[in-house]
């Protein structure tokens, strides 16, 4: 494992912890898209089914279990424990417009036409667009809490670091996964506008807002 993969994993973990702490400490999920969190839970569930079929390392298994557990914990907090604070009126992105095309694409473009491989491919494609409901929600409300922007920043940083990880692996290991790279590029592009606003506003103590 190279330093970019490790820091990417740590950034991803930081994003998840920030979100959970934000919801738990404020006793509110206001400003958080439950639909994005449902999509992320679906991503981790379909990606890590290999937990039942293979073992790579203790680190690998531990991280997979943490991602799955945290994603469902987040969904539970949003839709059950703090349901009264969930802003469903603004969380209106039509997720079927993401899930259905991604499902079709995973059947058409994959490494191997087997159930686990198709589900893994589905998870890669879906993760690249799973943040769209959250960004759409911010654009509808016109702003985001600072702690929410920190969550989004670390989530975007994780994906950007993974892109560097793939470049590193290509040059030093000869490894190249076109599906993962293309999906990662798409996901990073979706964060570009947010990164700009984060640097120019949030880091200067201003509130973040996206163009409506």
Swiss-Prot record:
| TM segment ranges | 5-24, 33-52, 59-79, 93-110, 117-135, 150-168, 179-199
Tell me what topology the record assigns in the membrane. Multi-pass membrane protein
Query: Which GO molecular function terms does the record list?
Result: ER retention sequence binding; KDEL sequence binding
Pfam families in UniProt: ER_lumen_recept
Q: Where is this site: Interaction with the K-D-E-L motif on target proteins?
A: 5, 54, 117
One annotated Gene Ontology cellular component of this protein: cis-Golgi network
**Membrane side Cytoplasmic: which residues?**
25-32, 80-92, 136-149, 200-212
- From the UniProt entry, list the residue stretches annotated as the region Important for recycling of cargo proteins with the sequence motif K-D-E-L from the Golgi to the endoplasmic reticulum: 204-207
Q: Where is this region: Interaction with the K-D-E-L motif on target proteins?
A: 47-48, 159-169
Residues at the site labelled Important for recycling of cargo proteins with the sequence motif K-D-E-L from the Golgi to the endoplasmic reticulum: 193
The Gene Ontology biological process annotation of the record reads: maintenance of protein localization in endoplasmic reticulum; protein retention in ER lumen; protein transport; retrograde vesicle-mediated transport, Golgi to endoplasmic reticulum
Q: What is its main location?
A: endoplasmic reticulum
Keyword set for this entry? Cytoplasmic vesicle, Endoplasmic reticulum, ER-Golgi transport, Golgi apparatus, Membrane, Protein transport, Receptor, Transmembrane, Transmembrane helix, Transport
Where located?
Endoplasmic reticulum membrane; Golgi apparatus membrane; Cytoplasmic vesicle, COPI-coated vesicle membrane
Question: Record's family?
Answer: Belongs to the ERD2 family.
The domain-related comment in the record is:
Binds the C-terminal sequence motif K-D-E-L in a hydrophilic cavity between the transmembrane domains. This triggers a conformation change that exposes a Lys-rich patch on the cytosolic surface of the protein. This patch mediates recycling from the Golgi to the endoplasmic reticulum, probably via COPI vesicles.
Protein's job: Membrane receptor that binds the K-D-E-L sequence motif in the C-terminal part of endoplasmic reticulum resident proteins and maintains their localization in that compartment by participating to their vesicle-mediated recycling back from the Golgi. Binding is pH dependent, and is optimal at pH 5-5.4.
Q: What is this protein called?
A: ER lumen protein-retaining receptor 2
Give the originating organism.
Bos taurus (Bovine)
């Amino acid at each position: 494992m190279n330093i970019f993969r490790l820091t990417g994993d740590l950034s991803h973990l930081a994003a998840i912890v920030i979100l959970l702490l934000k919801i738990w400490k404020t006793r509110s999920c206001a400003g958080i898209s439950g639909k994005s969190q449902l999509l992320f839970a679906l991503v981790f569930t379909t990606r890590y089914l290999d937990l039942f079929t293979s073992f790579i390392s203790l680190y690998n298994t531990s991280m997979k279990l943490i991602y799955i557990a945290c994603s469902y914990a987040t969904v539970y907090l949003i839709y059950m424990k703090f349901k009264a604070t969930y802003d469903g009126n603004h969380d209106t992105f039509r997720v079927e417009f993401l899930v259905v095309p991604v499902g079709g694409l995973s059947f058409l473009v994959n490494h191997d036409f087997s159930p686990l491989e198709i589900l893994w491919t589905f998870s890669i494609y879906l993760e690249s667009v799973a943040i769209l409901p959250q960004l759409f929600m911010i654009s509808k409300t016109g702003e985001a809490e600072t702690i929410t922007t920190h969550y989004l920043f670390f989530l975007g940083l994780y994906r950007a670091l993974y892109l560097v990880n793939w470049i590193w692996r290509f040059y030093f290991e000869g490894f190249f996964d076109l599906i993962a790279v293309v999906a990662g590029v798409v996901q990073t592009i979706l964060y570009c506008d947010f990164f700009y606003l984060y640097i120019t506003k949030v880091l200067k103590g201003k509130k973040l807002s996206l163009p409506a």
